[in-house]
From Swiss-Prot:
UniProt protein name: Endo-acting ulvan lyase
Keyword set, alphabetical order: Lyase, Periplasm, Signal
Location in or out of the cell: Cell surface; Periplasm
Location, primary (coarse class): other
Origin superkingdom: Bacteria
Signal peptide from the UniProt entry: 1-23
Keyword Lyase tagged: yes
Length: 816
């Protein structure tokens, strides 16, 4: 908005308070940029190759089409698909969404080039395309206005592009000499400018759906009104009638409808203190929220929206903490590892911070973008048209040169990261050299949220260049989300790495984010971690997190501890301690573990191959509509007889000779079942097409006093550095393990104590160990030459004549 309009807005704010009563029409363009900003953008194009390249991208998309249109307008316009009678088509039936979005993207890109070049051939092309739609939609009402036939797709695609094009060519359309191509006459003719407004009002009306039910402020909603919000807001800002524009904006921002919920009172309150949208990993980015807040702040600066939602701008920087060593993201719920919205978030945040003078936020955004570009090997400037992404040109219009010599860094590799709404705790231990190969990173947790899976406390592990132990994830297409493979397996317990109680673990339908999904579960909570969320560790070798689930659906308690333990720059392992008990009858517990690979080898701790026989024990379900717990999809199931001995399972990846070594200590009677499961989504090197290896471990009774304990060592070698894993016991209670590793010819012994209370006590007089607390480690290197004592949470740790006290804190670390 121009300066004069802003001044008028300030005066009117003073006169009328917070009820907006602007009396002056918008000056266009207004949505992304103003006329006052044009020269700054042209200066960028003149000075920087990346900006020049993106202007060229706009030309590359539309120039040939504009030339063809000048010669014969009907060539392009005649190929525009028919517009359906209303917006009742399903997402699968709206097959023309891509075609309509493409032609309106051409119109908007041409309009942007008109803004940049003042060349009216671009404006004429854009106007003619828009008029084609106006001639059809001007006779309709909001209820039957559509372009592709689907009410959810229209605002995300064609409506947004239509409004952007209109905004950029607004002044051209209002020239008395402007004409548009009318197909019926096969020539350029004068036109009724009011019809553009009629169509824009129809588009906004069909998106808001004021004719439907009202909004219920504060309710739990999906991401749909966020994804449609930019397209709706763009249309509102194009309405000329000041009073109607402000009324519609009030509906969008304050009042809301059941279809397009109030941005202020329903959408924004769902952002918690962490400032991220509460869904699965890739759905949480939601850059449209920062985009909308930024545009509102540009147009209505008097609202001071940037002051009220700083938690969201802070939350934009959380996601880079969720990358695995290969740069892809951890995956919980319906999520895709390769989907990355961080750069969009940083660009929008930077634009806002620069305009508002938030120097710290501006500096942080520049640093984050600089690190992103370094990770890519340099800034890859490119505008790429996409059906569901109208914001690509903002890379140019909101582009900012990022200095190459930024020395500051944001540490996105802290050992502990918590995602509270998803019940997730991340643990990592990275190395300076070849981190993609030797870095460790895993997550544990679970919860109900939109796009959640029902998993209890699930786990995901990275190692040796792969996500070795994957969660269920999301299929490639929307259609595949609705087939039994996703709904009855990947989204359920057995499609993830968790513990199933009595063969019946399941979710329920009441409260579920999706009809017929049966995925509601309680939220897993973090009860301990060292270091705390995004804090520095006390040791470069050890860290841990413990998650707890009070499962009221399955009437059980579960607690899971994940620790990453480093033994050298090239070796390290995960410790997984899973406690589980039914609060009624403990028949049996099943520890389910998936690993990508070509084969699974089961041996005893002495190297004896375990014999297995076919079994049908996992061809069952509880009889609910989704066949919980989901393990009917296990194939080629073969089980051992129950054994007390320790077990070493090796999962082999033939492609480049990588391995996951899994050690389960002796002492508890268990049977082990190998199986093949559906292929892992987004797996590397062809494993997306190969069956996933599964190991299911069944233990009769409870698994709290005798928890499932497993040590996982990813490796590039067929032989592991971990030599033995034996249990630490307190009478009949298993409280931890002794892990002996051999690294570069030197023995490293780790005594790892994992209790179920911060006030737990363990004493082993034979080993001369005494510990008070929840989690502690004693490391002995060589023949007692170096002793390391680590208290992750606790008061005192003693070993032989060595003592470590946490004193006023709950953590401590010392090397003797």
């Amino acid at each position: 908005m121009g300066t004069s309009v802003r001044r008028i807005s300030v005066v009117l704010m003073m006169l009328f308070g917070t009820n907006f009563c602007w009396s002056q029409s918008m000056q266009h363009p207004v949505i992304w940029v103003t006329q006052d900003e044009k020269q700054d953008i042209l200066n960028l194009i003149e000075k920087y190759d990346w900006a020049k390249k993106m202007e060229h991208d706009l030309h590359a998309v539309v120039d040939k089409k504009v030339e063809a249109h000048q010669k014969k307008p009907s060539v392009i316009l005649s190929h525009i698909p028919e517009i359906p009678a209303d917006n009742s088509l399903t997402e699968f039936e709206a097959v023309t969404v891509g075609d309509h979005a493409a032609v309106l993207t051409d119109a908007s890109y041409a309009a942007m080039l008109y803004f940049l070049t003042d060349d009216e051939k671009y404006a004429q092309f854009s106007a003619d395309v828009l008029w084609h739609y106006v001639t059809v939609l001007s006779d309709r009402s909001p209820k039957n206005t559509t372009i592709c036939g689907n009410h959810f797709y229209d605002p995300r695609t064609s409506y947004a592009q239509f409004a952007l094009a209109y905004d950029f060519i607004y002044n051209f359309l209002n020239k008395p000499t402007t004409k548009v191509y009318k197909a019926s006459a096969n020539k350029q003719q004068t036109f009724d400018r009011d019809l553009f407004q009629k169509v824009l009002l129809n588009m906004v009306g069909s998106s808001l759906q004021e004719y439907g039910r009202p909004d219920t402020h504060g309710k739990f909603i999906s991401n749909h009104p966020i994804l449609t919000a930019p397209g709706v807001l763009y249309g509102i800002l194009c309405i000329e009638d000041d009073k109607e524009r402000e009324r519609l904006f009030d509906v969008f921002w304050e009042k809301g409808t059941a279809h397009q919920n109030s941005f202020k009172n329903t959408i924004l309150p769902m952002f918690g203190k962490q400032g991220i949208w509460p869904e699965s990993t890739s759905y949480s980015f939601m850059p449209a929220v920062t985009l909308v807040l930024n545009i509102i702040d540009r147009v209505y600066p008097e609202m001071q929206v940037t002051q009220n939602y700083k938690n969201i701008y802070k939350g934009n920087f959380l996601f880079d903490n969720l990358r695995m060593p290969d740069g892809r993201f951890v995956r919980y719920g319906d999520s895709k590892r390769n989907h990355d919205g961080t750069e969009q978030l940083y660009r929008y945040t930077l634009n806002l911070a620069q305009r508002r003078g938030y120097s710290n936020l501006e500096n942080q955004a520049k640093i984050a973008l600089s690190q992103a570009y370094q990770r890519q090997g340099g800034y890859q400037s490119k505008i790429s048209p996409a059906t569901f992404n109208s914001s690509e040109p903002l890379k140019l219009f909101w582009g900012t040169p990022i200095p190459k010599g930024i020395d500051s860094k944001i540490d996105f590799k802290k050992p502990t990261v918590l995602v509270e709404h998803a019940g997730i705790a991340l643990q990592r231990n990275y190395v300076e050299t070849d981190n993609e190969l030797y870095g460790l990173c895993g997550i544990i947790g679970g919860a109900h949220y939109v796009h959640s899976h029902v998993t209890g406390i699930t786990m995901e592990l990275y190692g040796a260049g792969y996500v070795m132990a994957p969660n269920g994830g999301l299929p490639k297409t929307v259609k595949e989300r609705r087939i039994p493979l996703h709904e009855n397996y990947f989204r359920l317990y057995a499609g993830n790495n968790t513990v199933i109680v009595n063969g019946t673990s399941h979710g329920i339908q009441p409260g579920s984010w999706k009809d017929g999904a049966y995925v509601w579960q309680n939220t897993v909570v973090n009860i301990a971690a060292e270091p705390k969320h995004l804090e520095d560790p006390i040791s470069e070798h050890f860290n841990f997190a413990t998650q707890f689930l009070k499962d009221t659906i399955n009437n059980c308690d579960q607690e899971r501890t994940l620790s990453t333990i480093r033994t050298s720059e090239k070796t390290g392992y995960y410790l997984d301690v899973f406690r589980s008990k039914s609060l009624t009858e403990n028949k049996f517990q099943d520890y389910i573990y998936h690993n990508i690979g070509d084969a699974t080898l089961l041996e005893t701790e002495n190297g004896e191959t375990l014999r297995t026989e076919p079994t049908t024990r996992y061809k069952t379900d509880i009889g609910d509509p989704v066949q919980s717990p989901g393990w009917r999809y296990f194939e080629d199931t073969k089980s051992t007889k129950p054994i007390h001995k320790g077990v070493h399972a090796t999962f082999k990846i033939d492609y480049d000779e990588r391995f996951m070594h899994m050690f389960v200590p002796q002492g508890v009677n268990r049977s082990y079942t190998t199986a093949l499961a559906p292929p892992t989504r987004e797996a590397k090197n062809g494993y997306e097409e190969k069956p996933t290896q599964v190991l299911a471990i069944r233990q009769d009774g409870e698994a709290w006093e005798k928890p499932f304990i497993a040590v996982f060592e990813p490796s590039v070698k067929a032989s592991s550095s971990v030599q033995t894993v034996t249990p630490l016991q307190d009478a009949d209670k298993v409280v931890g393990v002794t892990v002996i590793s051999k690294v570069n010819g030197k023995l490293i012994t780790d005594y790892i104590i994992s209790l179920d209370s911060k006030d737990g006590v363990y004493e082993n007089k034979i080993l001369k160990i005494k510990f008070e607390g929840r989690f502690g480690i004693i490391r002995v290197e060589g023949e007692q030459k170096t002793i390391s004592l680590y208290i992750g949470e606790g008061k005192t740790l003693k070993y032989n004549n060595y003592t470590l006290d946490s004193e006023t804190a709950t953590t401590a670390y010392k090397v003797f």
